[in-house]
Design a protein with these regions (language model features):
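Short amphipathic alpha-helices in soluble, non-transmembrane regions
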Residues: 67-74
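Active-site nucleotide-donor binding segment shared across nucleotidyl transfer reactions
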Residues: 24-67
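Conserved small/polar residues in nucleotide/adenosyl-binding loops
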Residues: 121-124
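Acidic-enriched, low-complexity/disordered segments with a strong bias for Aspartate over Glutamate
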Residues: 3, 21-23, 51-53, 65, ...
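Generic structural hydrophobic/aromatic packing signal, biased to beta-strands
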Residues: 28, 35-37, 73, 99, ...
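Conserved catalytic core of two-metal-ion nucleotidyltransferases
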Residues: 78-116
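Helical scaffold of the NTase/Pol beta-like nucleotidyltransferase catalytic core
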Residues: 1-38
Length: 124
């Protein structure tokens, strides 16, 4: 059990280093959005999967603002890849972003960002 807790603690520390290095929260604030940490990192259950999940809220949600934030994130040399999905006309009504960050040991971290209008804050 102690090994599991140690792994979780180490991964949480590394994940928070990724968030600091990418300046992710400030990047989203710069386009008028609020980034909220969700998922396994927030709950303290980050184990094997190196993933960081954010719900991003904007009012109004503008595709151009979302792209501007991701352009700034892409300037970080540790970002290896970014994927985009426009689900504004689907039930989810969001923009999906997935970025892969290589840490100092070249381990990839997946950063999932779901960009939604403020009216969807009741879903978190």
């Amino acid at each position: 059990m102690n090994d599991i807790l140690e792994i979780a603690a180490a991964n949480q520390q590394r994940a928070r280093e990724v968030i600091r290095d990418t300046d992710l929260e400030a990047i989203w604030r710069s386009v008028g959005a609020e980034a909220n940490l969700v998922g396994s990192l927030r709950t303290g259950l980050l184990m094997k999967h190196r993933d960081i999940d954010f719900h991003i809220y904007s009012s109004p949600l503008r595709v151009a603002d979302s792209f501007a934030a991701m352009a700034r994130l892409a300037e970080n040399p540790r970002i290896r890849r970014i994927e985009y999905g426009n689900l504004l006309d689907a039930q989810d009504q969001c923009l999906e972003w997935h970025a892969w960050y290589a840490d100092a040991d070249e381990r990839l971290w997946q950063i999932d960002m779901i960009h939604m209008p403020v009216s969807y804050t009741h879903l978190t």
